């Protein structure tokens, strides 16, 4: 679809004809075909064929933002903000109109897990459930020592910690599923976000899969079907 926000066509893949919509974000270097190529679409195919689930895989701007080491962090974030606005103001409304559904699930893993949590916390009226596997939730992992501009609003451990009661009520309407293996180097980020949700009174389902690394496709494929549709 042509995006006025991004200034070019944004590709996507759509699987299914009926049912709830599951939006699968790619990981850091992936494109719209990544989740199919690594078998994630296949593990929910029975739901797709039964008309219970539609899967939509949009392209990202990750290669032109976070993966481009020639860019300063402020420019990486500016480009990511364009992607967020594309999703919020163009893609999600179009999906709702085309599918006739207004209860989408947003899934992401690794960098996509951070994107899913950040997007849903900023636009909770657009998302009914978040599934974030093996994510990080402190933007400083991407920006290092820089934390200027709008960075605060893309760092869940910062902006959720300071949310007022009105915003807490809004994001509490979203179903939050945050998980990874307890052997993942990012496991502490999942613990931290889960504890933060608890302190703010935000219902969330948090899992640390015992005895496994968790930060890889076989684990994501194993656990995703548990949480859809």
Label every PLM stretch briefly.
Residues 1-229:
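Non-catalytic cap/lid and distal C-terminal segments of serine-dependent acyl enzymes
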């Amino acid at each position: 679809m042509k995006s006025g926000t991004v200034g070019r066509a944004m590709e996507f893949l759509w699987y299914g004809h009926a049912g709830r919509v599951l939006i699968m974000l790619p990981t850091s270097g992936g494109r719209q075909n990544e989740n199919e190529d690594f078998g994630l679409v296949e593990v929910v195919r029975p739901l797709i064929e039964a008309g219970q689930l539609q899967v939509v895989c949009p392209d990202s701007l990750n290669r032109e933002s976070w993966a481009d080491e020639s860019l300063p962090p402020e420019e990486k974030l500016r480009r990511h903000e364009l992607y967020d606005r594309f999703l919020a103001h163009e893609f999600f409304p179009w999906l709702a109109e085309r599918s006739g559904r207004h209860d989408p699930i947003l899934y992401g893993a690794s960098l996509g897990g951070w994107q899913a949590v950040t997007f849903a916390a900023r636009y909770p009226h657009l998302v009914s459930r978040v599934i974030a596997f093996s994510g990080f939730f402190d933007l400083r992992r991407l920006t290092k020592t820089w934390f200027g501009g709008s960075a605060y609003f893309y760092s869940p451990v910062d902006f959720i910690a300071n949310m007022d009661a009105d915003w807490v009520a809004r994001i509490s309407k979203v179903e939050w599923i945050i998980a990874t293996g307890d052997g993942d180097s990012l496991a502490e980020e999942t613990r931290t976000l889960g504890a933060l949700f608890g302190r703010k009174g935000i219902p969330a389902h948090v899992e640390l899969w015992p005895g496994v690394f968790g930060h890889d496709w076989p684990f994501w494929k194993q656990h995703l079907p548990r949480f859809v549709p």
